[in-house]
């Protein structure tokens, strides 16, 4: 039984642009601030992307002291580490970097699949970095509460929603993503963080913030500005973040892992069985959930 559908908007509200930007800023600040109160040490996941960087920036301003930030990357092509480091330097945080390699990823793969309880290969791949980072945080520090930047994409749009043909199509996709949160990004954050005995807190999921952003006229959320998530970026212009971080586009595979980890998982799955064995496994499925690659087939076996 659903007690509330936060994706449901009876009618879009008609605030003007200055009011929208002010409310986005004030409501997200409030969402971060109320999640800073804890009876255990608090840390922050920092990928170097817009969303986690904003959470860290707000927290640093509110606390008035260096916050503890954590980033992760592969030893070969850590796409986001340099951006996380740039943000940390700007905020003056106590920054920690965890470097992982192919062996660490593959040795944890079955455990992550078990924890997630999903066959979705994208969610599994995106979870590897977060799981290993939280594992390191638990083992190496006393941090037991982590603030993250999840749910911003569902509210303000993914890269592909930049090409939404109409405002209605954008809103429908956003509503679908919000209603399916428990299946993907929130599943990833909840399982990867809590399995390492750490509490996750998600300011972008603040109900007041979500209700407001979902009620913004979708015409204003469409990418008519040459930049995705324009409203969120514009709301935090000023001294919140370096401009190159605030206006940076989201990178492909930017789960702090890079292309090398994706390739490592594919190569590992390819080594497990031949093309003939893969086709035999596919034949055991109906059209529903039929694995389309060896990597996907591997997740079904785990």
Where are these regions (language model features)?
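Conserved small/polar residues in nucleotide/adenosyl-binding loops
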Residues: 299-302
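ATP-dependent adenylate-handling active sites, centered on carboxylate activation for C-N bond formation
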Residues: 6-240, 253-270, 278-290
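Conserved S-adenosyl-L-methionine
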Residues: 244-248
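Non-catalytic substrate-recognition/targeting regions of SAM-dependent transferases
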Residues: 1-5
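Long, low-complexity C-terminal extensions of enzymes
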Residues: 291-297
């Amino acid at each position: 039984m659903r007690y509330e559908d936060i994706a449901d908007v009876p009618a879009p509200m008609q605030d003007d642009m200055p009011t929208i930007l002010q409310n986005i800023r004030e409501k997200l600040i409030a969402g971060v601030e109320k999640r800073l109160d804890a009876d255990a040490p608090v840390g922050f996941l920092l990928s170097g992307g817009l969303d986690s960087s904003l959470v860290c920036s707000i927290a640093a301003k509110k606390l008035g002291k260096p916050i503890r930030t954590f980033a992760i990357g592969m030893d070969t092509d850590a796409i986001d580490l340099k951006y996380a480091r740039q943000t940390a330097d700007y905020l003056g945080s106590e920054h920690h970097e965890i470097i992982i390699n192919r062996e660490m990823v593959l040795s944890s793969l079955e455990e992550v699949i078990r924890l997630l309880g999903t066959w979705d290969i994208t969610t599994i791949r995106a979870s590897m970095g977060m799981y290993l980072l939280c594992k390191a945080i638990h083992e190496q520090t006393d941090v037991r509460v982590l603030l993250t930047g999840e749910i911003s994409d569902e509210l303000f749009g993914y890269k592909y929603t930049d090409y939404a043909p109409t405002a209605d199509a954008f809103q429908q996709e956003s509503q679908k993503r919000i209603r399916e949160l428990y299946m993907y990004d929130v599943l990833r954050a909840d399982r990867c963080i809590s399995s390492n005995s750490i509490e996750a807190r998600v300011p972008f999921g603040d109900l007041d913030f979500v209700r407001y952003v979902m009620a913004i006229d979708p015409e204003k959320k469409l990418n008519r500005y040459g930049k995705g998530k324009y409203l969120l970026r514009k709301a935090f212009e000023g001294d919140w973040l370096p401009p190159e971080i605030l206006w940076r586009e989201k990178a492909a595979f930017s789960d702090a892992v890079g292309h090398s980890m994706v390739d490592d998982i594919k190569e590992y799955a390819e080594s497990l069985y031949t093309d003939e064995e893969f086709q035999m496994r596919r034949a055991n499925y109906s059209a529903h959930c039929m694995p389309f690659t060896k990597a996907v087939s591997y997740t079904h076996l785990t």
